[in-house]
Every structure is written in structure tokens, then in C-alpha cells.
């Protein structure tokens, strides 16, 4: 059996340093992996007293109410990035007004994006034919539920989207998406 000389045994300082380095690396990796998960459940808030998320166009740029209204006629329903980046319809109610609610464009059947059909005045899902009226209430299945709602607020020409937690005005029931 060979005996180790004192110079062969690592010093306690070196051992502590290696333990600290290993622990720090593992902690950094774990926190880095948890960051996107935390952002998914707690999206960053973009200014505004309403506490909502800034509505963004297809390029990810924040939308201004004046710019949106100048490019979209009354009655228009166009997609923006809403809560958690979900496609959400902004409704133009007049030449100077964006509706106070938006409609999440994700079908409640299998999650397809539901386009607005202006000729039929309803949303029609291309995947399995579910249909929703102009306010997003389901009128024909197989979708089991109406499209989710979101609050739309305009503050200082900025458009914000926030969670709808009140009674669903289309059904008179508690919202299924909260």
C-alpha cells in the first residue's frame, strides 16, 4: 500500500474552491432554465397604469392607437400580439376608437389560429370548421367554448392588453380562461 505525502493531498482551500465552483455552475444553469418558465407565467408589464402588456404588431413593435386607426377602417378586426404573445384581435369600433375588448384568436378545439371572415361576419376555424360570432362566442362546434377575451386599454396613444377576469358578457358566466 502506498502512502500519500502531504504534498499529494489537495489543500482544503482548493477543495472548497472546487465545491463552490461546482455549486455556482449548477445554480446558474438551473436559474437560466427557470427564467423562461417564470416569464411565461408572469409576462413583463410594459408601462401604463392599467398594468397590461403592450400590444405589438407582427414584427414585435408596440402599437400606437393613432397609427392603428389610420391604417384600419371601422369594423376592422386585425391580429396583434397580446398576452403571452398570443394572437389577439383588435376591433376598430369607429374612426377614432379601438374596442375595449380583444378576442384571443386561438381556437378552443385544437388550438388553431382562427381567421376573421368579414363576408360571413364571423370567425371560422380552418382546421375543423368551428365558428364564432363577431364577439367570439361559439356558434358551431366542434369547439366546446367561446374564444377568450382580453381587456384593451389605450393610454397616451399606447395600446395595452390585460387579462379579462370579470364575467363573460357573451355567456353571463365566469370566464373559463382565468
From Swiss-Prot:
Annotated EC: 7.1.1.6
Predominant location: membrane
Catalytic activity: 2 oxidized [plastocyanin] + a plastoquinol + 2 H(+)(in) = 2 reduced [plastocyanin] + a plastoquinone + 4 H(+)(out)
Intrachain disulfide bonds: 112-127
Transmembrane helix in keyword set: yes
Keyword Membrane tagged: yes
One GO molecular-function entry: plastoquinol--plastocyanin reductase activity
Residues binding [2Fe-2S] cluster: 107, 109, 125, 128
A Gene Ontology term for the protein's cellular component: plasma membrane-derived thylakoid membrane
Function: Component of the cytochrome b6-f complex, which mediates electron transfer between photosystem II (PSII) and photosystem I (PSI), cyclic electron flow around PSI, and state transitions.
Subunit description: The 4 large subunits of the cytochrome b6-f complex are cytochrome b6, subunit IV (17 kDa polypeptide, PetD), cytochrome f and the Rieske protein, while the 4 small subunits are PetG, PetL, PetM and PetN. The complex functions as a dimer.
Additional observations: The Rieske iron-sulfur protein is a high potential 2Fe-2S protein.
Name of this chain's protein: Cytochrome b6-f complex iron-sulfur subunit
Species of provenance: Prochlorococcus marinus (strain MIT 9211)
